[in-house]
C-alpha cells in the first residue's frame, strides 16, 4: 500500500480500500522534502509533487475517502504552515494534519494549530497523560492520537481517552507497533465513548501480523470486531520462537 501511493496510483489504492469498507487513508509524501532541509523549508516543486497523491484520490473517488496528512513531526512551524496553506487553497479537504511539528514542543504545535483552519492531530509519540494534558490545555489538537505501546499501556491509555473526553475531543488509537498493541488498541477503541477511528495498517494486518499471532480482531466492512474471550485475545503462534529468523530477547529480575 505504501508503494501504491508513493510511486503508483493513489486513486487505485483508494478504490481498493473502499471495497473493504475502509473510508479513510493516511499518506506522508512530504517526508523526503523534510529530510532534505531538516524541516525548515519546502520548495514549490516539492510541494506540488507531494500534493499529487491527494489530488489523485479526489479525482478518482471524490469525497468517499477521508484523507489524513501525516507529517511525522519533521517540520518547523513556518514550513508546516506552508503545507497547510497549500491544502487550504485546493479543494482537497484533508480530514486532519497529523504531527506537523515535534509533538514534545507543545508551544510550536499550538502555534501551528492556531495558524490553520485545518484540524490538527497529535500524537502517538507522547509518553503519558501528563504530555497529553499539556497538549489539551494548550488547545493544540483537534483529535488525540495515542499508541498503547508508547503512552504507558492500556490503563494509561484509558486515562488519556477519558482526559480527552473531558476536553470534548475524540481519540484515534494508532497502529504501527505490532499485533498485540493493535489488538489492545481495538479494545480501547470499543470501550472509549469518544473513539473516532481505529487505525489499521492493512499491509501489516494482512501480512506479518498473521505470521506472529492468532486471535487478531476482525476487520470487515470498515469495522473492527474483537473476539469474546478474556484479555486482548491475541496469542503467539506455537513454535514462533523456534523459527530460524526469530530473534528472542529475554528480560527478568534477578
Predicted features, each with a name:
Residues 1-110, 115:
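Metal-dependent enolase-superfamily TIM-barrel catalytic cores that perform enediolate-based chemistry
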Residues 213-254:
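C-terminal extensions of enzymes
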Residues 5, 45-49, 152, 177, ...:
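Catalytic cores of large soluble enzymes that bind and process phosphate-bearing ligands
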Residues 85, 92, 96, 102-227:
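Shared catalytic-loop signature of beta/alpha-barrel
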Amino acid at each position: 500500500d505504501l508503494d501504491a501511493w508513493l510511486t503508483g496510483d493513489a486513486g487505485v489504492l483508494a478504490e481498493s480500500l473502499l471495497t473493504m469498507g475502509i473510508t479513510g487513508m493516511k499518506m506522508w509524501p512530504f517526508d523526503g522534502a523534510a529530510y532534505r532541509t531538516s524541516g525548515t523549508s519546502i520548495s514549490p516543486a516539492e510541494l506540488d509533487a507531494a500534493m499529487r497523491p491527494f489530488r489523485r484520490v479526489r479525482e478518482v473517488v471524490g469525497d468517499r475517502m477521508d484523507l489524513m496528512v501525516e507529517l511525522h513531526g519533521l517540520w518547523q512551524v513556518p514550513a508546516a504552515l506552508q503545507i497547510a496553506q497549500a491544502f487550504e487553497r485546493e479543494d482537497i479537504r484533508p480530514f486532519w494534519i497529523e504531527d506537523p511539528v515535534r509533538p514534545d514542543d507543545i508551544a510550536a504545535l499550538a502555534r501551528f494549530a492556531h495558524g490553520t483552519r485545518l484540524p490538527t492531530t497529535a500524537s502517538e509519540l507522547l509518553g503519558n497523560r501528563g504530555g497529553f494534558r499539556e497538549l489539551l490545555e494548550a488547545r493544540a489538537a483537534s483529535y488525540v492520537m495515542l499508541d498503547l505501546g508508547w503512552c504507558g499501556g492500556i490503563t494509561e491509555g484509558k486515562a488519556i481517552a477519558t482526559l480527552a473526553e473531558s476536553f470534548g475531543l475524540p481519540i484515534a488509537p494508532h497502529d504501527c507497533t505490532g499485533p498485540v498493541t493493535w489488538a489492545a488498541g481495538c479494545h480501547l477503541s470499543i470501550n472509549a465513548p469518544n473513539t473516532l477511528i481505529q487505525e489499521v495498517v492493512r499491509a501489516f494486518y494482512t501480512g506479518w501480523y498473521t505470521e506472529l499471532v492468532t486471535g487478531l480482531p476482525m476487520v470487515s466492512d470498515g469495522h473492527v470486531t474483537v473476539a469474546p474471550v478474556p484479555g486482548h485475545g491475541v496469542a503467539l503462534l506455537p513454535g514462533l520462537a523456534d523459527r530460524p529468523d526469530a530473534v528472542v530477547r529475554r528480560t527478568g529480575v534477578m
